């Protein structure tokens, strides 16, 4: 059994999703939640909350591997920079505990789950719910975190079949 922590980083809310993968490659939902960072003071205090909150979550759930969504250029450069800072704090929380970090672009996650890189949030939420047999509507950040964990599980399974590491299984010639 392998436990994967998926992280959808954000400067206001960071999505957390944890799944277990059995020997047959089947995914089982363990936990999902938003890590709310608003109301934690200034931006540096929010980053501190993210670092400590993820650390506590890692200590509680003991994942074997971590998958995190890459930064994308969104509405503005300032937003992208804040997202990059939050992502950096999340990665620090992970590597401080000697866990491997695997990174996936949002388009790669959408392609892996829905079959098209331009899928919308509703399609991703729906597919995550189906794949993990979850009832009710998922919040977007939790769905994205679970989606990146599922994507890593698929890449991991493909890598094992091919006898390569996960980076080789996912990389493409440019």
Swiss-Prot record:
Its EC number is 3.1.21.10. Homodimer which binds Holliday junction (HJ) DNA. The HJ becomes 2-fold symmetrical on binding to RuvC with unstacked arms; it has a different conformation from HJ DNA in complex with RuvA. In the full resolvosome a probable DNA-RuvA(4)-RuvB(12)-RuvC(2) complex forms which resolves the HJ. Keywords: Cytoplasm, DNA damage, DNA recombination, DNA repair, DNA-binding, Endonuclease, Hydrolase, Magnesium, Metal-binding, Nuclease. GO terms for molecular function: crossover junction DNA endonuclease activity; DNA binding; magnesium ion binding. HAMAP family: RuvC. The RuvA-RuvB-RuvC complex processes Holliday junction (HJ) DNA during genetic recombination and DNA repair. Endonuclease that resolves HJ intermediates. Cleaves cruciform DNA by making single-stranded nicks across the HJ at symmetrical positions within the homologous arms, yielding a 5'-phosphate and a 3'-hydroxyl group; requires a central core of homology in the junction. The consensus cleavage sequence is 5'-(A/T)TT(C/G)-3'. Cleavage occurs on the 3'-side of the TT dinucleotide at the point of strand exchange. Belongs to the RuvC family. It catalyses: Endonucleolytic cleavage at a junction such as a reciprocal single-stranded crossover between two homologous DNA duplexes (Holliday junction). The active site is at 8, 69, 141. The lineage of its organism: Bacteria, Pseudomonadati, Pseudomonadota, Gammaproteobacteria, Lysobacterales. CDD domains: RuvC. Mg(2+) 1 binds at residues 8, 141. GO terms for biological process: DNA recombination; DNA repair. Mg(2+) 2 binds at residue 69. This is Crossover junction endodeoxyribonuclease RuvC. SUPFAM superfamilies: Ribonuclease H-like. The gene is ruvC. Binds 2 Mg(2+) ion per subunit. One of its GO terms (cellular component) is Holliday junction resolvase complex. Its cofactor is Mg(2+). It is found in: Cytoplasm. It comes from the Bacteria.
């Amino acid at each position: 059994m392998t436990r994967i922590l998926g992280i959808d980083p954000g400067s206001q809310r960071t999505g957390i999703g944890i799944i277990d993968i059995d020997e047959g490659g089947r995914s089982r939902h363990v936990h999902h939640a938003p890590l709310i960072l608003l109301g934690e003071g200034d931006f540096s205090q929010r980053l501190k909350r993210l670092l400590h909150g993820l650390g506590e979550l890692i200590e509680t759930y003991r994942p074997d591997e971590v998958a995190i969504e890459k930064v994308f250029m969104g509405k503005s450069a300032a937003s992208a920079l804040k997202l990059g800072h939050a992502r950096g704090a999340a990665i620090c929380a992970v590597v401080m505990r000697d866990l491997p970090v695997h990174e996936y672009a949002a388009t790669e996650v959408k392609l892996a789950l829905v079959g098209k890189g331009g899928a919308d949030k509703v399609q991703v939420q729906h597919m995550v719910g189906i794949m993990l047999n979850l009832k009710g509507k998922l919040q977007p950040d939790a769905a994205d975190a679970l989606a990146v964990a599922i994507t890593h599980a698929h890449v991991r399974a493909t890598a094992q079949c091919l006898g390569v590491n996960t980076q080789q299984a996912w990389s493409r010639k440019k």
